[in-house]
Amino acid sequence: MIKKLKEIPFFKSTEMKIAEKTLQQINDLEPSVVNLTDEELQNKTDEFVRRIQEGETLEHIRPEVFAVSREATKRVLKKRPYDVQMLGGIILDLGSVAEMRTGEGKTITSIAPVYLNALEKKGVIVSTVNEYLAERDAAEMGEVFSFLKMTVGVNKPSMSPEEKKQIYQCDITYSIHSELGFDYLRDNMVTNINDKVQRGLNYILLDEVDSILIDEARTPLIISGGESSSSYMYEVANQFARTLQPGDYEIDEESKTIKLVDSGIDKANKFFTLSNLYDIKNSELVHRIQNALRANFIMKKDVEYIVKDEKIELIDAFTGRIMEGRAYSEGLQQAIQAKEFLEIESETKTLATITYQNFFRMFKKLSGMTGTAKTEEQEFIDIYNMRVNPIPTNLPNIRVDDEDSIYWGTRQKLNAILKEVKQVSKTGQPILIGTSQIEQSEQLHQLFDQNGIVHTVLNAKQNEQEANIISQAGQLNAITIATNMAGRGTDIKPSKEALAVGGLYVLGTDKSESRRIDNQLRGRSGRQGDIGYSKFFLSLDDQLILRFAGADKLKEIFPKSEEALNSKQLKRHFSNAQKKIEGFNYDSRKTVLNYDDVIRQQRELMYSQRDLILVSEDLLFVIERMVFRSVDDVLKNSMFLLKNGGFDYTKLTEYINDQWLKPFDFKFEESKLSHLHEKDLAEYIFQNLMEQYMIVRQRLIDSFGEDSILYHERSILISTIDSYWQNHINSMDKLRSNSNMVQYAQKNPYQVYTQKGSKKFERLIVEIALQSSVKLFNNPSAYRQDQMEEVMIEGYTQEFIDKIPESEREYFKTLPQDLKSKIVKNLIQLEQSIAMVESNDQSQDLQSITIDILPDQNLNNSSDEAK
């Protein structure tokens, strides 16, 4: 009932009721704000910050802040935000999605909520889909923010950590969405807490929110490292795939999955000389074969990817853009390289990963704006707890959205499009033709060339000319073929002459996987109350029908014809197929989230443990916990238990002495351990191990100082956690791939993944504790003075680098390591000498104890080393 009420125009959400009430308050304040001088208007920022610090809430000061923001925007940009833009801004501050049609001024709408949340001085992030938009919006809107005493920065992938840290310290940071996620992952790989660049996840406003949170939700962010692997198996798997006939495998068109049938399995057993392909020992080979099948029979060139400069470049299915720097994971990239006979790169090892869904859900407040999101509202509610609020247009929408025309086959559809373009172009009306695949755009390109129709093509292959092509698409006589216009950041503005002949004509050549994407294409026409027209030309050969509506059966029902098949039944088939694939894609995204939620809980525990180690000034409590966990695990190990009960004390004693006490004089005695009550054994071993560790630790502190020992302990703990965690997430990746194989045994893959993943994580915690404690007890640098000095110098070197002025820091890093060590070693001696003087309260001239920082007095003063 509630859902039906929301579809009635006069039904308003709670957010919209709040927004309208607040808008009235803003408008009531406007006369008084207009009379403020520039200085008085600017000083309002200081007043708002003070009031927030004194306890006022953002909600309480929202009307005043929005009124000030509106006036500042009017004075700086010479544009007074419309009431509907203020409504949109309030919705954004409420942590919801503002659905605003193309051309309604989303960028200006963002100013007020960003300004309001930046007043908390905790940092606000505005995320865009590409770097061009981030720089453009930061430059244009930054003028308003600067006027209001707010600092603005742009986060770029090319920046150094030092530069990024400064950018994140700004009141407002603009960034592409992927870089935010990568910065978060990198922050959780640092070995010094001061090297983190982000300062907390407070408030984020996502432009094109549906593109980021829906379309890209299935693509996890991954930081990878090189891992040696032979290209031979990819090539062999590809050779096998090329021997198969269509009857050897089965493709599920709906899910785009593929599997071998009995004849294919028999061929695999013969090809690889196996008795049973699906034996557990062959799981790695099955994974390679599965990727080869996907690469050869599912992944299509110029649809999912292109080959450019002998490299595989991925295509964003929703925007048509090349996804720079992206690659398929889990060996699929290498399988496609083998298919295309390209050089096969090493398969990478995952070092850190997170999905967009789980990353953005960590923000204290999340909001977004887009032209189309209402059709996906349930997903926004279920996953992000965000409602979608359509914002009224400033001027009525007068674009005409015509009925779809459906044709029997591709040839008939193309002929109809050609005829329509010829007819419409006679008046000079600009035409934008939207295709979903590069292959379609190039088909039309050839057809138009053959018929002498002057046109321009925009797809992933011409991505570099995008801005120029789009800027001309609204001019008289312009005919533009574009692959997936969704996500394009530049508005098409029809010229006066074009508006006089009907405005922009949007012609869709097929339905996409989402009504939302189709609505975005339509929305390119009729911006800001302009006249416009849209129409879709479809056929029974379109991918949507082939995958989800049984094209062959429909072709049997409807006789072949050159004219459009005007049938309500057919239109229902297209509509139902689109809803079906929307549901399938939602389930797919939900599955990705479910699997990532398992690793998310583990990741949060690992990252919190890491942070605890990085910030703690005393790590003994961590070390004690790890030693006790290790001892407890050893005593539960079956190799030390006798069949008739009790322990094999000989083995147990040898193992503990060998693992922890090699460098120590103290050793456990079998006779002593065997006389203890079993329940007291763990505590006794733990207490004695820690006692020995503390003796040596104190001796090292006396020699080298507590800071050096802390640095040494921290380094061992962090490096062990990182190494084992990285191995774990790669193990979890393989577990997920292999868990799909249990479907053959009628088991639930997700349940298998969850159960086995939990056991793996429990073991991971124990292994980290065991290896960390063993390294701390046995690391040679703790007992050899020369190596301990190296550890100490390494720690001081980083501390010294942090103190160097930024202008000189990079130069110091380029010096030879031995010279850096000598400089820092001398500085340590100098610090110790000064400390000695201060502690003895001596007043002697410090010059008398100053040593030469540069060790070699004979260095030429003009040399790099002297500098």
Curated annotation (Swiss-Prot):
Membrane topology listed for this record: Peripheral membrane protein
SUPFAM superfamilies with a match to the protein in the record: Helical scaffold and wing domains of SecA (SSF81886), P-loop containing nucleoside triphosphate hydrolases (SSF52540), Pre-protein crosslinking domain of SecA (SSF81767)
Location(s), subcellular: Cell membrane; Cytoplasm
Listed GO biological process terms: intracellular protein transmembrane transport; protein import; protein targeting; protein transport by the Sec complex
Record: residues binding ATP: 85, 103-107, 491
Top-level taxon: Bacteria
Top class in the EC scheme: translocase
Catalytic activity: ATP + H2O + cellular proteinSide 1 = ADP + phosphate + cellular proteinSide 2
UniProt entry keywords in alphabetical sequence: ATP-binding, Cell membrane, Cytoplasm, Membrane, Nucleotide-binding, Protein transport, Translocase, Translocation, Transport
E.C. designation(s): 7.4.2.8
GO terms for MF: ATP binding; protein-exporting ATPase activity
GO cellular component assignments: cell envelope Sec protein transport complex; cytosol; plasma membrane
Subunit text: Monomer and homodimer. Part of the essential Sec protein translocation apparatus which comprises SecA, SecYEG and auxiliary proteins SecDF. Other proteins may also be involved.
Primary role: Part of the Sec protein translocase complex. Interacts with the SecYEG preprotein conducting channel. Has a central role in coupling the hydrolysis of ATP to the transfer of proteins into and across the cell membrane, serving as an ATP-driven molecular motor driving the stepwise translocation of polypeptide chains across the membrane.
Family classification: Belongs to the SecA family.
PANTHER family, per database record: CHLOROPLAST PROTEIN-TRANSPORTING ATPASE (PTHR30612:SF0), SECA INNER MEMBRANE COMPONENT OF SEC PROTEIN SECRETION SYSTEM (PTHR30612)
Protein name from the UniProt record: Protein translocase subunit SecA
